[in-house]
Structures are given as structure tokens and as C-alpha cells.
Amino acid sequence: MNIEELKYKILQQFGFPPTPEQAQALDVFVQFMTDSNPHAVMILRGSAGTGKTSLSGAIVRTLRAVRQKVMLLAPTGRAAKVFSLNSGMPAYTIHRRIYREKAFAGVDGQFNLNDNLYTDTLFMVDEASMIANLGLGGTTFGSGCLLDDLIHFVYQGRNDRLLLIGDKAQLPPVGEEESPALSAAMLQGYGLSVYECDLNEVVRQSQQSGILFNATRIRQMITHDDITQLPKIRFSGFSDIREMPGAELIEALGDSYHQVGLDDTIVVTRSNKRANIFNQGIRNMVLDREEELESGDMLMIVKNNYYWMEEERKKIKERQLSEERKVKSEKFNTLANHIVQSNEVPAFLANGDRAKVMKVSRRIDLYGFHFATLLLKFPDYDNYELEATVLLDTLTSEAPALTHDQQEQLFHKIEEDYQDIPLKADRMKAIRQDPYFNALQVKFAYAVTCHKAQGGQWSHVYVDQGYMTDDMLTPDYIHWLYTAFTRATEMLYLVNWPNTQIEG
């Protein structure tokens, strides 16, 4: 298919005339797709409200219609869910597609870079601003540098190429000053031929949105290097952005939970300490929760966990073997193969994944810590259900997860139970397989930090920036504020917003 044919087919999928910037981006995309260079890559940078989502959706629908193979990826489960809803086809986490488990070693699994068996495939990665390359998470996954591994994976395939989609005004990955996956210079360093385009103009249908009007103003402070005073927010004339006095917050949150649900409402704040305060207040005063943890509570995983998914895979395999022994017919074997696929479990539970408590079945105090056995449902993984042991101590701690000292304390207490195993190597192996040592570390998910919310979208978003003065103004704060604002799709509430930051 030539350039003009591909461009015409994508335009047909738009449903409305593209903006000049969208048309230019489309020109770049069709050139990228028809380039014979096997090492071509494209970056599509677009800010909130500029039509990036509608453009990528039209591209996906067109490529599927012309039978061009496409794989949709995103850095987190929530981001993959949003990408899937916006494009109309399944999307997966990057980790789930590019890594395979080498060996389960208890707390820290070991995942190697997978072989890329895809051919003639376009890998489209949304929310690429979140892709890190510093290796802060150690080497549990491949080289420890996600961007390195993603590029290596894609370009080891035959005639595969990569389209990175993201917003450079959002928070960059932790420890990095900018998002490496959205940098043309960074990608050229891999020997890739880079196509790039930017969408900056807010499309007409977005101009009536107070969320996008103010987010655009904040973004322009970044692009124009005009970070000299705290931004003033315009509320008047808009119905989708509101000041939220603290005295009205409890009632407003209750209304949001009633209107759009617990899973589509979020409070975004600046620290784990503030998130804890909000979570306790919401549970006690809005949801009337009296127990430490109850059915219906929303939780967030705060440390990667590999053990429980490995246990799930073992259970599924055992069930299938048991059924196969009962019935050996060809008809059943076909059914069994279908069951294997339909029960595909996530490779691991990632820091930031959200879960709903369906049942609290057992509580126990052991080793100086508090545990519970829960039935959990994961809304970002097709409502996958899992029974697991959860560590309750992290629910209200100010630290992001168990501290190093607490982890050491838990390890040594559990080790005492395995003193009958003489060889240290065997003893370590047994501890790493212990369900309490591998208990899920969780926090309540009604209020989260902005890094935890990044990649997701919620109908109702409440933003708490805490106390701010001009002296505390940094580029990081402006990126934080922009990222927090753009999590909202319907209503944005600014909690206890100071008069000095309101446009008069």
C-alpha cells in the first residue's frame, strides 16, 4: 500500500476533519510506516486535549482494517486499560509482553528479555513518558533499563517497528529530568532513524473544558520556561473544574462514589503521608468503615510481587492435569487448551496495581506483623480474582512500603521456623517460598501520590497540593500539577485551593 492510500484510509476513520497538526502528524506516520529502513522509530508527542488519542485510535482502526499487525502496550495495567478502551483492541503492559520468567526466587523473581517472535508488527506504546532508563529497580527485569530492553526486543524481530506516544509535560520517571523515550536524541543514540511530531494545539471540542484550559496554561509555563510564580487557576465559565473547601469534601466524595463509583474516583496528593491521612479520613467518614480492612475496600500494591502469580499458574496447571486425567477425549483436550488461554494470569503484580477486596477470610498475627487472607479482584486485569496473603502493616505506614529494617526483621523471624533445615541454601529456598515472607504489601487506594496515578484516568479527580508558596516553586511541581490535572476526564476538584492561586 502506498503513502496516499494509507493516509486516505486513516482519514476515513477520523469522522471529522483533522487539525493542521494532526494532518502533519499523519503525514509523518505514513512516511514512517512506508520507510524501508528496518530501524525506523516514531515519536508522537501530544499534550492533553490536542487530539493525540483520536489520532492514535484512527491509526489502530485503520491498521486492523488493512490487516497490518499491531501490538498495543503501556507501562502500567491502568494505562493499558485506558489505551484499550480508547483504541478498541486489547492492550498489554510492556513487562507482560517483552519479559519471560527465568526463575522464581521468592521476593525477587528473575525475568529475562523474551525472544521477539512477532514479524511485520507495529508496536504502539502509549504513556511513553513513564518509561524509565535508569535501572533504579535493579535487574529483576532484563537489563534493568526498560527503554533499552523495549528497543532491543522490538528490533530483534523481523520487520518490526516502534511508535512511542506520550506527553512530555507529564512527570518524568523517578530520578530522571526528562522522559527518555520521548527524546529523539536518546533514540538516535540506539542507531535508529527517528520520525517525530508534536501536537500542541488544543482541538476545538476541548476548548470548552476548564480542565484542559488550565492544564494547557500550566503546560505553557513549562514550554515557555515561565516558571516564576504559582499558576492561577480559572474556575469561572467552566462546569468541569471546581474549588473544593475542606468542609465540603466528605459530602462531595460520597457523591462521586455514588455517581461514578469507587474505582472511577481518585484523590491525588503530594506525599505518602498526605495520602494516608486522606485514606483514613475517607474510610472512616465517607465509607463508614470500622474494621482495619473490609470487603469492598480498594487497595494498591506498593511493591512488585511474583509469588502469588506463580502460585496461580501452579494451581491452574494442576487443575488442568486433573481434568485431563478424568477425560481423555479429543473434544476435551480442545476445551482444555481453551481454558489455558482464557486463564492466562498476569506475569506478576506490579507496584501501582489496584485491587478490590471481595472477601476477608482470615486474620493472623505472626512474627510481629499482621496478616490477612483476602480474595482480591483486579479491575485493570479484566477483573481477575486471586486469593492471597496480605501484610496489613503497610496499610497505614508513612513509608512507601516495608522499610529495609522491617523486611530484615520479618526475614529473621520466619527463618527461626526453618532452623530444622540444616543446609543454609535449602533454608533460604524454603523461606523464599513462604507465603508470609511473600505477603502482598498494600495501601488503601482512595488517595495516592501523583506518580502512582500517572498513566490512569478517572472520571472524578480531587487534587490536594498541600501548602505551597512561590519559594517552593520548581519545574517538578509544575509537571506534578499538570499530570494531576490531566488524570480527570469529567470533573476536577481542587481541595482547599488558596485564593492567591485563583484567577480573579
Region locations from a protein language model:
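Conserved pre-motif I regulatory segment
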Residues: 2-40
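ASCE P-loop NTPase helicase motor core
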Residues: 26-27, 31, 36-231
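Short, conserved phosphate/pyrophosphate- and ester-handling motifs at nucleotide-, phospho-/glycolipid
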Residues: 22, 76, 271, 455
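Catalytic phosphate/metal-binding cores of nucleic-acid and nucleotide-processing enzymes, i.e., regions
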Residues: 39, 77, 336-339, 362, ...
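Short, solvent-exposed amphipathic alpha-helical segments in soluble enzyme
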Residues: 88, 282-286, 478-482
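Conserved helicase motor core of P-loop NTPases
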Residues: 3-6, 29-30, 37, 154-160, ...
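C-terminal accessory regions
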Residues: 351-353, 357-360, 365-504
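Conserved SAM-binding loop
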Residues: 18, 72, 267
